[in-house]
């Protein structure tokens, strides 16, 4: 279970993802309780437990190869992207720039964990900067477009690190991290900051920090988890946790960024992909994972994307069945009112006839 990259930190009451310098893998969920009691707080480094599961063919790690050239092994970049010895800059702090970097190799892992070391910084004051970074696991790569420098109506997974509130009516606090799964039928609405297609999100103060900022994305057996380390405390903080997510294998990892009238430097320092050693049922093993359509078993109604100041959504979202039942009850109510009204009207007419 060490390779799963999780630990139950004794006394914390929550699980944390591991990365170098952070608490790493410990006893997994299947570990007997008496062993947990005997072992107590087991803490290790992910580089010890997971180094052999780092997938270098899908990872971007310093020292970079190809500095000063227009290409590098295993990765392609386009647009305004520049490669330096310290970082990959997707966009400079200039207006109307787009850039991206994409892995050469399609990923055929069913269970994985991506750690991203990034930095968003610039000279713009509050709400005078933009637009943010997008992290991708998608069917198509190197296709520029309006969604943080990449294409709209994509197939796959996107994690948006949005720094500018386009919707002036929103109460959410920016910067904001959100998740979207798409089968090509959905369009990202910048004017609403993607609220209509967002699965979940959280406020995350990652811009212009004086220390390193990290994000971790974990996908395993239909569960998608996003965590952040933004406070220089070597601790992961929960951001997003969704179940029922279906993603195919054979898609590509990438990162992109875009600026408009407002701008920022958008830098990627590293992207490290770890393979998670997870047991699957025989039925799951027999599935052709390359043919799976990106989907989520549970999608929120857009009306449920009503923010509170903390960036959380109200509970009790309206599913399709709930909307149907609500409309059915409303229709029945109208029919009952109409019938009662007709009966009352008829009785009044009969009463009036008797008087004449």
From Swiss-Prot:
The keyword Membrane applies. It is a single-pass type I membrane protein. Its main location: Golgi. It is found in: Golgi apparatus membrane. Binds 2 calcium ions per subunit. GO terms for cellular component: cell surface; COPI-coated vesicle; cytoplasmic vesicle; endoplasmic reticulum-Golgi intermediate compartment; exocytic vesicle; extracellular space; Golgi apparatus; Golgi membrane. Ca(2+) binds at residues 162, 164, 166, 193. This is Vesicular integral-membrane protein VIP36. The gene is LMAN2.
């Amino acid at each position: 279970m060490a390779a799963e990259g999780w630990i139950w930190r004794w006394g914390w009451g929550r699980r944390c993802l591991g990365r170098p310098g952070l608490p790493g893998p410990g006893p997994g969920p299947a570990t007997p309780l008496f062993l947990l009691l005997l072992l107590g707080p087991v803490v290790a480094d992910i580089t010890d437990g997971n180094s052999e599961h780092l997938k270098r063919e899908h990872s971007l790690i310093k020292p970079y190869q190809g500095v000063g050239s227009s290409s590098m092994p295993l990765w392609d970049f386009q647009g305004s992207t520049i490669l330096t010895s310290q970082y990959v800059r997707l966009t400079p702090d200039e207006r109307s720039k787009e850039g991206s970097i994409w892995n050469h190799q399609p990923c055929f892992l069913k269970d994985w964990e991506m750690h991203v070391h990034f930095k968003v910084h610039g000279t713009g004051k509050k709400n005078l900067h933009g637009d943010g970074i997008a992290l991708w696991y998608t069917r198509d790569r190197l296709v520029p477009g309006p969604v943080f420098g990449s294409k709209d109506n994509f197939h796959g997974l996107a994690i948006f690190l949005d720094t500018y509130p386009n919707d002036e009516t929103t109460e959410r606090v920016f910067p904001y991290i959100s998740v979207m799964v798409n089968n090509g039928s959905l369009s990202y609405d910048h004017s609403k900051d993607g609220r209509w297609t967002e699965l979940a999100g959280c406020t995350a103060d990652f811009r212009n920090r004086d220390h390193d900022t990290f994000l971790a994305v974990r996908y395993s057996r239909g569960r998608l988890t996003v965590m952040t380390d933004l406070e220089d405390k070597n601790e992961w903080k929960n951001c997003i946790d969704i179940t029922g997510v279906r993603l195919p294998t054979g898609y590509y990892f990438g990162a992109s960024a875009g600026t408009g009238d407002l701008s920022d430097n958008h830098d990627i320092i590293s992207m490290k992909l770890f393979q998670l050693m997870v047991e699957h049922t025989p039925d799951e093993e027999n599935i052709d994972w390359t043919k799976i359509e990106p989907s989520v078993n549970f999608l929120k109604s857009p009306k449920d994307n009503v923010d509170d100041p903390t960036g959380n959504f109200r509970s009790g979202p309206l599913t399709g069945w709930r909307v149907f039942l609500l409309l059915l009850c409303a229709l029945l109510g109208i029919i009952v009112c109409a019938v009662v009204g007709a009966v009352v009207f008829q009785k009044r007419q009969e009463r009036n006839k008797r008087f004449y």
